[in-house]
Amino acid sequence: MAIVTTDSGLQYEDIKPGTGAEATAGKQVSVHYTGWLQNKDGSAGTKFDSSKDRNDPFGFSLGGGQVIRGWDEGVQGMKVGGVRKLIIPASIGYGARGAGGVIPPNATLIFEVELLGV
């Protein structure tokens, strides 16, 4: 699959296209995800969170600002059953403040997101 780069700097790649309902703005979605800090060479580094490890899917209203902008943008257009890799620059991630002592300031993040339901 090809890596797509959006105007915001988000990069995404569909690892496995879904075949179910499409995630669009305003819909409640349920996902499994794993997040890593990106190493300087672009590879996935330290894993900082995973709903899969907890077996606890995460739900949110897409496009409503409940999550970082990179997620609101990157999950749109996915279809249920699909898996997408998101590379999220700090500008649409946690920015200069970082998050919770786990994500340092200005960190680029890598997420693997599986859309479970819409």
Residue spans for each PLM region:
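Cross-family detector of peptidyl-prolyl cis-trans isomerase
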Residues: M1-V118
